[in-house]
Amino acid sequence: MDCLIANINENDQFLERLKESESLLNTFYQYDAMSPESFEQALNAPNNGREQELASVISNYMSDLELTEAQQINIDKLKKGAKVVIGGQQAGLFGGPLYTFHKILSIVNLSRQLNEEYNKEVVPVFWIAGEDHDFDEVNHTYVFNTEKAKLHKVKYHTMTPPESNVSRFIPDKDKMLEALDDFLVQIPETAHTNHLRNEVQHIIKNYASWSDMFKALLHIVFKEYGVLLIDAQDPKLRHLEKPILKEMLKKHDEVDRAFRQRQAETVEAGLAEMIQTDTNVHLFLHEDDMRQLLTYEDGHYYTSKSQTAYTLDELLEIVENTPERFSNNVVTRPIMEEWLFNTVSFIGGPSEIKYWAELKAAFDVLDVTMPIVLPRMKITYITKRIEKLLKRYDINAEHVIADGIDNDKNKFIRAHASEQFLNELDQLEAQQKETYERLAAEVQGNEDNKNLVEKNNQIHQSQYDYLRKRYFINIERENAISMKHFRELNETLHPMGGLQERVWNALQFMNEFGTDMFSPSIYPPLRYTLKQIIIKP
C-alpha cells in the first residue's frame, strides 16, 4: 500500500487554532496538545493506583477472545503502571463508519511513537461506549453499490428498539444475518468475500449482545497491534467506579455549575456551544428496563421517565450494591474515563475534542486531570479504479476530497457544449431583455400594461433558463457513462458532502483487499499527523 500526506484546506477553524497552539484555546484544556513538554509532563505524572484492578477488569472483559501475545503483554504493562492513549466510539453496525477504525489506528500509532520517543511504556486502549442508548445512531451503515454508482443504506430492522444501554441489547441473529446479506449483495464478489462473510457470520452466531459483536469484530481486525478493549457498561468496571460515582452524586451541583460556567466562557471566546443537556446530575439510572436521566429538584433525584424519587442516601446505596445500574452522560463520561486510566492522550473526533473544551472545570471539581486532547487522524482510501478515473478526467483527488466533484463535472459538461449555441442563446436573451426594457418604458404610465410586460418578460426569461438547463441535461445524457463515473468519484471521495471515513464501512474495503488489510503486516506504518492521509491499497 502507498501512503501520501495531503494538505487539504480545513473548513474547521477550531482545528487550525489547535494546530497553532492558540493561547486562548489552550486555556480550556489541561495541556497544549502541540507541545512536546506537555507529553513529557503527562508521561511523568503520578499514577492513580487503580492500574492493577483495571488490568484485571480488562482481562476479564476480553476473556471470551483469543488474546494475542501483544495484547497479553499490554495487559501486563497496564498492570505494572503503563500509561495509555485512549479513545472510544459507539458500537456501530458492522463496525460503523471507517473513522472508528481510524481512531484505533490513531491510538495505536501515537502509543508507538510515545514509546519510541520518550522511552516510556504506553498502551493503546479503545473504549466501547456501550452505555449509550441512542440506537438510531448505530443501527445502520452504508455500502457503495458500484453498479448503480450510489450509496445504499444497510439497517438492522426492529420494531422494538432498545430503551436501555446498547450493551444490554440482544439483537435477533437472523435479522443481523439479513443485514449482512444486504450489505454483501451490493458489492462485487471477490476472492475475499467468502472469508469475510464467514468471519462476520461467526461473530453474529457466537456473540449475544450488540456491543459484544462490535468488540469481536474490532478484536479480529486490531488484535495484532495489542489493542485493549473495554466496554463502559461492563459490570466489573462499574464496581471499580463506585468511589467516583458516589462523588459525582454528592458533588453533582458543583459539577453542573462548573460545566455551565465553563461552557459560557467557551461561547464568549467564540467557540460553538457543543453540549446541550437539561440535567443537573449528569448521570443515568437503569430502571424499568430503560436508561433514565437523573435530575435533582427540591431535595430529591428523579428519573426522567418513571419519575421515581430518590434521596441521596438511597442512590448511594444503589451505587454500593448495584453500580451497573448507573451510566454517564456526555459531561461525566470523559471524567469517568480519565479517573480510571493513567492517560497521556485522549483521541477524539472533531466534535468530541470541541466539547471537551467545555469540561475542564468539571474535571477540576472531581480532582481528575484532563489528558492531552487530540483529534483522530483522517484517512481516505483511493483504489486503483478510482485512481484510474481521476487520471482519465484529469481530476485532482485532494480537490474532490475537500469540495466534491461538482466543479470538475461542470467543466466536463461545458467542454462538451457548443460555444456557438451558448453564445447565440446569450445574445438572444440579452436582445430580448433590451426589447422588453423599451416596451416597459413605453407603457410606464399604465400600471396594468407595465405589469403585463413584466410578467411576459419573466415568462420568456424563464424559457431561456429552461432551454439552457435542458441543453446541459441532454449533454449529461449523451455522456451517461462519464456522469456515472463522476458520481462514483464523488460518492467515494466526498460522500454526503463530507469525508469518506464518515460514511463508508470498513467491510467494503476488506471485501476488496482482504480481511487482514488493516493488519501491521499489510497496512502502511503511519506517524500521527493532523494532515489528511491518502492510502492507495
Swiss-Prot record:
Domain of life: Bacteria
Molecular function GO labels: ligase activity
EC number: 6.-.-.-
Pfam families: CC_BshC, Rossmann-like_BshC
Keywords, sorted A to Z: Coiled coil, Ligase
Coiled-coil intervals: 417-457
Broad class of enzyme this protein falls into: ligase
Reported function: Involved in bacillithiol (BSH) biosynthesis. May catalyze the last step of the pathway, the addition of cysteine to glucosamine malate (GlcN-Mal) to generate BSH.
Annotated family: Belongs to the BshC family.
Protein's recorded name: Putative cysteine ligase BshC
